[in-house]
Curated annotation (Swiss-Prot):
One of its GO terms (cellular component) is nucleus. SMART domains: ANK, BRCT. Residues 407-1055 are annotated as: NSE5-like domain. Residues 318-332 have a biased composition (Basic and acidic residues). This is SMC5-SMC6 complex localization factor protein 1.
């Protein structure tokens, strides 16, 4: 939110007391005024538990105020500031399967936007209303709703002329109408609710009634008549009923209220008649089947009777024959009886097999429907995040778009205008013809080349307007030809080395101040702004592709499989057009490193350019990840395992030098819910590893979060879980486990056995800080030797660096070259806080090697030096005291104060933990001039540390939980209309039949089955929640508890 935005005035409606108190605690962390009243008090934001018809809900709609979900408070509290309201507004998402009508779902958003568009003060601003209602609490509530919508409420005794509405109870309407005192139409009280929640603002009442009937009939048909034999007869009856009702409504001239009542009564009568017709049809079919069975039985009886008569006749004839013939006949009869019994038995088994097969098919169909519905929800959630959801299904673009040639004369004109440097006129000509023709690539390249040379400074914005209009009118997914068009367009007009080459040059130019791929304008600032604008266009391009893919898969998710035709720009750039490619290709690796580095740079300053660049890179990365995931879901790929093993581990290891606060900001900045979820999990695993807590390697699931991560969260906030070891700084071998991880992260195709000895894996949590330093520097050398993963830190400034990323400052401090250090510090633009590839600063190196004079010169000459800079929590003071350099420690404490003593490394060690002598500890502690003992100071620091650990873990788990429930449809709203019990039965059937059919061997269904079962057991599981989690006062922990409580309550209500 902007700093000058008005202060939030919050009210709530629809919440239970416990939940309202929990949300109220979160509001204490934010800048707002919370009004705890049952009456509407002219708030700015109303937080509603559900869609309802309460006084506050109706009044907020009438006044055009923000009506938001509770997630707005939870997420804002987690972020520490008020977030943008748009995505949290009731009406932002329309649930097709909800029992609320689309009009009611969108009412708050529609009225707010309508009042903002028209400038009207309220929904009733032209009303003069007389209320004929008994004076009580309800009448006062109606007055507040009307006044919120700026209606003029007039007493009945003082009724002037010009009354527009008379609102009365049903009992008084007829009597008051007969008096005709007000000369105005009468409306029932219900009319206010219908006007606000059901009325289409731009449509008349007939169309609204028509849409209501359509919704009603479709719901009834889906619920009652799907499997009935008389479905077609019922459908016809409903259509006739609806047509007759609409016709009568159009010709109705009576009062609005009486008309609506009669129409509703007639429609109900006709609906009952139609149900009777259906019952008659069912009865007729049942009678027909019964008659048919009787006829069959009668025919069988006649056959049996004739056979019996024939046999009796034959028996009399055979009595005259010899006993031998009789015995022969008896044996023959026995054979016939045995054969008949055998055939009858076989027919019974055949019928049973047929019935069993039908049951299997029916179960298979249910499971396939469930799988399609689950995928459809994931696609829909993805489309909503990219603002791509549509109510109507759009036709697929399957027609080739031909690059209609410009008329030769116009082409010659534009070419001559560009050659004559009449760029304004050339751009205007292109703009005027853009709706009818697709501009040739070479013309757009000619203009871009001049823009890069700073020849079109004034009109460069008009050029990007052409590109935006081109993307809107002719998107890349329109045809394979348009996809190729954009791939040709988005490359350097001079070098023509491809799309990825241009993207790389643009990012390096903005991030590292590198030169362009060819000679361009010397206006550095203007060039960087231009390069950033080109990156914005690229971001819009790929974001539109993700939006289209999500929408397309959502629209066609009912089909068994949808083949994605054509080549997408995103797929071509990052995965060379290969749909089955692994996630971490060279472009994706480089984009990940750039995104992480841009976040580090953003945190160093408030520069707008750096912040915008970080936002763009995060958005591009999120769009690429989301595209790969959605495409993988359509192909049946297990994206959960791939994402957890690849991207999550990559980012976690690359952010070793991030503090917990930096990681919170970094994870929250991801636009991709998938990326947030998996990076949060990887960081949480690392946190558990540092606390010696074992975690299983299975993919992320709700079961794992509840039964594994929640208990682990309690252990992170318990003292004594860490193993204290005094590290040795010099001479240890690198940690080979990280080298193995590095090979995986860099996407190198070599075998792990090459260059790596067969040794047992080491635990990173047991590696000392110095060992990690040597390890990270060796990684720097290794990564620089790889062509597909060039070192990025070497490009920070104009100073030369070695393969480890060490600058001249680093080397001077390592080698104790004081004179050279003083010379370097006197140079303009020198950065004393520059880091090498492993994250160490020159001050770290001086403290590590015990070069006291170098430390003294840095502290005296560089007041901007960062004494809290850390790698895995290792600060310069840690470095000095862990190597026994007490004098350096005293210098640092004199300049940094007591805050330096409170810093812990990744293993929880304080700087004074490295000091064995109690006397030296007291001397160092005395420098800070704290009026306390060392023991009390350490106890308070330890308590604060474990509180931070618990808060950070709660943040990570909250991110996992919220994003997981959002992606897989485990929110209470989604489960309510699906039916939790029905889902459980289907998924249990899925597991029971898993071994007998291939339909059920689907990882997504297996995951969802475990999630549903965990949801049902969640209330019992939370009874064993760790005590320290329950009592922690931190905002993230409280938000986590509120989320879990809401999930438990919703599951209990649904079940």
């Amino acid at each position: 939110m902007e700093d000058d935005a008005p202060k939030h005035i919050i009210q709530m409606t629809g919440f239970k007391v416990e939940e309202k108190e929990a949300l109220g605690k979160l509001l204490l962390k934010l800048d707002c005024t919370f009004i705890k009243s049952e009456k509407y008090k002219n708030c700015t934001h109303l937080i509603a538990e559900r869609l309802c018809k309460s006084e506050k809900f109706l009044a907020a709609c009438a006044a055009g105020k923000w009506v938001l979900t509770k997630d707005y408070i939870i997420h804002s509290a987690q972020s520490g500031r008020w977030l943008d309201e748009t995505t949290y507004e009731w009406g932002y998402k329309i649930e097709k399967d909800s029992h609320y009508s689309p009009q009611m779902q969108s009412a708050p958003k529609r009225w707010r936007e309508e009042l903002k568009r028209t400038g009207a003060p309220g929904a009733f601003h032209k009303w003069k209303v007389v209320l004929l209602v008994r004076a009580d609490k309800r009448s006062d509530s109606l007055v507040r709703v009307l006044e919120a919508g700026k209606a003029n409420v007039i007493l009945p005794k003082n009724s002037p002329t010009g009354i527009t509405h008379v609102i009365a109870s049903n009992a008084r309407i007829k009597a008051e109408q007969e008096k005709d005192d007000f000369k105005a139409p009468f409306y029932p009280i219900q009319y206010l609710e219908d006007f606000l929640l059901e009325k289409e603002i731009h449509n008349d009442e007939d169309s609204q009634t028509n849409s209501t009937w359509k919704n009603h009939s479709s719901q009834e048909k889906s619920n009652d008549f799907r499997e009935n034999m008389g479905f077609l007869e019922m459908k016809g009856t409903l259509k006739e009923t609806m047509c007759r009702t609409q016709k009568e409504m159009k010709n109705h001239d009576e009062d609005v209220t009486i008309s609506s009542i009669l129409t509703e009564h007639q429609s109900k009568e006709r609906f009952r008649d139609s149900r009777k017709n259906l019952k008659f049809v069912k009865m007729r079919n049942a009678l027909g089947r019964h008659t048919y069975r009787n006829q069959e039985m009668k025919k069988k009886d006649e056959d049996i009777q004739s056979i019996y008569t024939l046999r009796k006749k034959r028996k009399k004839e055979k009595e005259r024959d010899s006993r031998k013939d009789i015995e022969h006949d008896r044996s023959t009869l026995r054979k016939h009886i045995y054969r008949d019994q055998k055939e009858r038995k076989n027919s019974v088994f055949a019928g049973h097999a047929k019935e069993s097969k039908t049951k299997d098919i029916r179960t298979n169909v249910d499971i396939v429907d469930l799988k399609n519905a689950l995928r459809k929800h994931i696609y829909r959630a993805q489309a909503v995040r990219y603002r791509g959801i549509r109510i109507d299904k759009q036709p697929a673009y399957n027609v080739e778009v031909k690059n209609a040639e410009f008329p030769r004369g116009i082409l010659n004109l534009i070419e001559s205008l560009i050659e004559g440097q009449f760029f304004k006129e050339a751009i205007e000509e292109l703009s005027s013809l853009q709706a009818h023709y697709i501009p040739p690539v070479y013309l757009l390249h000619a203009l871009l080349e001049n823009i890069l040379q700073d020849n079109i400074d004034t009109f460069s914005g008009r050029y990007f307007h052409i590109l935006s209009a081109l993307l809107h009118l002719h998107p890349p997914w329109k045809s394979p030809a348009m996809s190729t068009y954009y791939l040709e367009l988005f490359q350097c007009p001079t070098c023509m080395k491809g799309t990825w080459s241009l993207i790389e040059v643009l990012i390096r130019s903005c991030l590292f101040n590198e030169s362009f791929c060819h000679q361009i304008s010397e206006n550095i600032i203007g060039s960087k702004v231009l390069h950033l604008t080109l990156l914005k266009f690229f971001f819009n391009l790929i974001e539109s592709e993700v939006r289209h893919l999500s929408q397309k898969l959502y629209d066609w998710s009912d089909s068994q499989s949808l083949k994605i035709t054509g080549k997408a720009v995103l797929l071509e750039i990052f995965w060379s057009g290969n749909e089955t490619s692994g996630l971490l290709t060279k472009p994706v690796n480089m984009l990940l490193e750039w995104t992480i580095y841009s976040h580090k740079e953003k945190c160093k300053s408030n520069d707008v350019f750096r912040h915008e660049l970080a936002y763009l890179l995060t958005g591009i990365l999120g769009a690429a990840i989301d595209y790969w995931i959605v495409l993988g879901l359509n192909m049946g790929r297990n994206v959960m395992r791939h994402m957890s093993d690849d991207v999550g581990s990559y980012v976690s290891l690359s952010c070793d030098d991030f503090s917990s606060q930096d990681l919170e900001i970094f994870i929250s900045s991801f636009s991709s819910s998938w990326l947030q979820m998996f990076v949060a999990e990887a960081v949480f695993k690392k946190l558990c590893l540092q606390n010696s807590i074992s975690i299983s390697s299975e993919p992320l699931s709700l079961q794992k979060m509840v039964y594994s991560y929640l208990p682990a969260l309690g252990k992170t906030g318990v003292r004594g879980t860490r193993k204290m070891q005094k590290p040795k700084k010099i001479g240890l071998r690198p940690c080979f486990e990280s080298q193995r991880a590095l090979i995986m992260l860099n996407g190198a195709k070599q075998k792990q056995g090459e260059g790596l000895p067969e040794i047992p894996e080491l635990n990173l949590a047991k590696c000392s800080s110095s060992l990690k330093r040597l390890k990270k520097k060796s990684e720097g050398e290794l990564s620089c030797s790889k062509e597909n993963c060039p070192s990025l830190v070497t490009k920070i400034n104009f100073h030369k660096t070695n393969l480890k990323g060490e600058t001249a400052l680093h080397r001077a401090c390592i080698n104790n070259q004081v004179d050279r250090l003083i010379l370097l510090l006197s140079m303009p633009g020198i950065d004393i806080n520059v880091k090498d590839n492993a994250g160490w600063t020159p001050l770290h190196e001086a403290c590590n090697y015990g070069n006291t004079v170098c430390v003294q010169e840095i502290l005296q000459r560089c007041p901007e030096v960062d004494l809290l800079t850390q790698v895995d929590g290792v600060t310069p003071l840690h470095d000095a005291l862990s190597n026994g350099h007490v004098e350096i420690g005293k210098l640092l404490l004199q300049h940094g104060g007591p805050v330096l003593l409170q810093q812990r490394n990744s293993k929880g060690e304080l700087p004074l933990d490295y000091v064995v002598s109690s006397q030296i500890k007291e001397e160092l502690f005395a420098i800070t001039k704290i009026e306390d003992t060392v023991e009390n100071f350490h106890a308070q620091a330890e308590k604060h540390f474990y509180h931070q650990q618990l808060e950070f873990g709660s943040f990570l788990l909250s991110r996992m939980l919220l994003n997981f429930c959002s992606i897989f449809g485990l929110s209470s709203e989604s489960l309510a209309f699906k039916g939790l019990t029905h889902l459980s039965e289907l998924l249990i059937a899925c597991q029971n039949y898993k071994e007998t059919t291939s339909v059920h061997t689907d990882w997504l269904l297996d995951l969802y089955a475990r999630n549903i079962m965990t949801l049902q057991k969640l209330p019992n599981a939370l009874k064993e929640l760790p005590e320290n989690v329950k009592v922690c006062p931190g905002v993230h922990t409280e938000a986590l508890l509120v989320t879990l409580e809401v999930m438990c309550r919703s599951v209990t209500e649904i079940s």
